[in-house]
UniProtKB/Swiss-Prot annotation:
Pfam families: Ribosomal_L3. GO terms for cellular component: cytosolic large ribosomal subunit. SUPFAM superfamilies: Translation proteins. This is Large ribosomal subunit protein uL3. Part of the 50S ribosomal subunit. Forms a cluster with proteins L14 and L19. It comes from Pseudomonas fluorescens (strain Pf0-1). Methylated by PrmB. It comes from the Bacteria. NCBIfam families: L3_bact. The modification N5-methylglutamine is found at residue 150. Transmembrane segments: none annotated. Gene3D superfamilies: 3.30.160.810, Translation factors. Keywords: Methylation, Ribonucleoprotein, Ribosomal protein, RNA-binding, rRNA-binding. PANTHER family: 50S RIBOSOMAL PROTEIN L3 (PTHR11229), LARGE RIBOSOMAL SUBUNIT PROTEIN UL3C (PTHR11229:SF16).
Length: 211
C-alpha cells in the first residue's frame, strides 16, 4: 500500500541505541490526516484517498472548498493532498496517523527546501571561481563565458547562471524510520529532511523499497 501522510517538521535531535551509538534523527509530527474523499476506478478512473490536515479559518475557505469539506463532515484544513491507493478502503471522515509506519521501514520524505534568495553561480551551482591573482581583478566570482559567438547566437536553455536558489520541492529517498511514537503521533526518521522547522512534509513508503 503506497499511501502516505502529511506532517510537520518539528526539528532534529539524536537518540542512542543500546550499544551507545548516536543516531541523528528528524522528528516529524504527524497531525491527524482527515479523509475528505475516497476515489475509485468507477467514479474517478483510479483509486486514491484525499486527505487534509491542520486548520484554516472560515474566512480563508472558498465556497467550493467549504462544500467539499462539509460533504466529508470534516473541518477545513490548511492543505489537501492525494495519495494513490493500491488496496484497502477508506471512508470520508476516517483518520490516518503515524501508526501506518513501523520502525525499520524505509520512507521517502518530500518538502519545500529552504529559500536562499538570489545567489551567484559559486553557491548555487558549485562553480570553482577564478584566480585570485595572476592578472585577475574584480572577476574572482564571475561565471565566465555563457556561450559561443554568432553561431548559435544565443544562450542555450538550462545554462547554469545566477538566480533564485532554494524554495523548491525536494524529495529525500529511502530514509529509515527509527522510531514510531503512536501516542504523540511522532515519526523519528534517520537523517535530515528538506525544509525549515514547521514546514509541511509528505511521508510515503520508499518507492525503491517497493521494487
Amino acid at each position: 500500500m503506497t499511501i502516505g501522510v502529511v506532517g510537520r517538521k518539528a526539528g532534529m535531535t539524536r537518540i542512542f541505541t543500546e550499544e551507545g551509538v548516536s543516531i541523528p534523527v528528524t522528528v516529524i509530527e504527524i497531525e491527524p490526516n482527515r479523509v475528505t474523499q475516497f476515489k475509485t476506478e468507477e467514479t474517478d478512473g483510479y483509486r486514491a484517498v484525499q486527505v487534509t490536515v491542520g486548520e484554516r479559518r472560515a474566512s480563508r475557505v472558498t465556497a467550493a472548498q467549504a462544500g467539499h469539506f462539509a460533504k466529508a463532515n470534516v473541518a477545513a484544513g490548511r492543505t489537501v493532498m492525494e495519495f494513490r491507493l493500491e488496496e484497502g478502503e477508506y471512508q470520508a471522515g476516517d483518520l490516518i496517523n503515524a501508526e501506518i509506519f513501523a520502525a525499520g521501514q524505509l520512507v521517502d520524505v518530500t518538502g519545500q527546501s529552504k529559500g536562499k534568495g538570489f545567489q551567484g553561480t559559486i553557491k548555487r551551482w558549485n562553480f570553482r571561481g577564478q584566480d585570485n591573482t595572476h592578472g585577475n581583478s574584480v572577476s574572482h566570482r564571475v561565471p565566465g563565458s555563457i556561450g559561443q559567438c554568432q553561431t548559435p547566437g544565443r544562450v542555450f536553455k538550462g545554462k547554469k547562471m545566477s538566480g533564485h536558489m532554494g524554495a523548491e520541492r525536494v524529495t529525500v529517498q529511502s530514509l529509515e524510520v527509527v522510531r514510531v511514537d503512536a501516542e504523540r503521533n511522532l515519526l523519528l526518521v534517520k537523517g535530515a529532511v528538506p525544509g525549515a522547522t514547521g514546514g509541511n512534509l509528505v511521508v510515503r513508503p520508499a518507492a525503491k523499497a517497493r521494487g
